[in-house]
């Protein structure tokens, strides 16, 4: 029994190889058709593979940590854990009280520091982490050691852990680097260890880590550093849901540990989600939307190539009829034709893979720099498998209908010399028309989505940010963090810099601030307000806080609604003045005069809800609302605090309303800073218009990518319409010649061709717009101030498809009108 099976198997294998060899010969005999089909399919396969590469690398590829599924992020208030911040004391308390976590830790924001000798420091990103952070990740150092609990005690020998990339670039991966010192923000730190290769923690651009420190014996210190993100490793068998339920049960006891009252958001429910999801969850809907769009591109490409294959079938009907007459079964013919389609698909897949690789490189450079895991994007083996699968699927999709059509030819008709009559092609034309209508419908679906996103982006760009961005330049001026240890030094430096800015020839207005609008850098202000109930059992109030010099309001063009702005006399701190925005005034004291009212930071209360008039700030003015956390968001309560000696800090932003242009003003600023201290770097120089543009980078990148995909869909769909109309005109040349000979006008011939093209476009557009009306609900979360059934977008898409149909019909219509009836009849 074995030998017959082997013979049968080898026989089948031989047939498959023979089919493939024959398929290659057929494709080589039609190089024009083959090249067109391969390129069309390669566009669809390449686009799908490129987006799948992003999905695989960003959403699916595991983090480089052992048992990464047990790593979670902790948040509160139902908000994304990415925006939840905790004090180090709370994180430590969770680790002590919770039984769900094997370890709980935290890390600070991604901040730039002066790294190197005082004469030539470089600005490099680093982060503070709690000493158990790297052990929580369960990773091992590439060299040296990680932090120990002693490293987290204030006054202990300062240490640093380097990223593998920094170690490689600056120390050539030499083990001798361990124990050496580097200067970070004026502090000499001993290199304790190096992260393993491939680990980017906690941010993609982090180059070094320093430990969060605790002051022993200070009961308040653990609650002051309120900028840590919390994460943990779950115990075996514990799910994020179980950990979340436990944290919600512990929420009130943990909240009671704070030395002051917290805002109401802290009384809302805690959240626990996988670490990977916390990093990329916000990106998932956008990537899936793009994947759906490029999936439609592949369907459009398959329909286009199916039509090309049907057109080519006209020249092969005689061949198929003869093979059928010689005994080839329909199944055998279908298999042969599908072999040709599969070969085309595989060749297109190979080209598409190269196209995808180039597209991925371009995408990773073009996407916003803060896109999660964008530096990790590469072609892993699942991408190769996906490309191969997409190639075979494409070959099946575009090859099946032509194969079924070609495998059942009518022998008499195929061998008849006059078989070019339209009557013999009615069935083929109907199939081709259906495919073209489908192409147009899918193209309309994609371009409508792109149109809605573009309209939304335009509406977003029309939002008034609340300040005048034109001609304003911002720049970061960075002293060493250790400079403020000498009380008053940082404040004196920036006060002197402010005086020098007054003499700048290139600026009309100037100011210093601790943050720039629309960058989400502003701090939080937790307070009680005069006239509002104060109860130790209730949450405190919360506002966004910005520390500024008096010129800030004029530089940004903010409008005084009531009272006055901050003045130079407020910089000493004696007046205890504060300016608030309209929203805060209306929310706290509706229909009342806010001037003279007082607010008190909770840290200035000796006991929760105990008012101390001498420590309170007095509202001296109200200004218009400005957007802080994005143009699409609602206004938040804002307080503007004067830059007093008590609020000194090592890093401030200079804001200049320029006369001479951004570059000239920035150079003047650098000279002014260098005149005070040539070693202080001036970085992040950009215009406020660039800041505003960066704030909408995510919706802009999505809209532009979908527009590119939509343009590709239109191009393929337009070619499909043109090819079909041209093919029909070619087959109806005899009929057109006879009609012209019988007196038909050329105008009538042109109208008939254009009418047919418009009917195809009308049918496809109607189907596409109906589909878009239903699919538009999926876009709702991406739209700003635009309805999913936006009449402007739908009208423009309909007009665009009409124009496309006219353009696609123009050349075939002219060709039809130029038919010579005499030559046509003579050929008959």
Residue ranges: model-predicted function:
Residues 2-35, 65-66, 77, 112, ...:
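Membrane-helix entry/capping segments
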Residues 43-70, 310, 359-369, 442-471, ...:
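Alpha-helical transmembrane segments
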Residues 51-53, 306, 341-414, 452-455, ...:
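Small-residue-rich transmembrane alpha-helices
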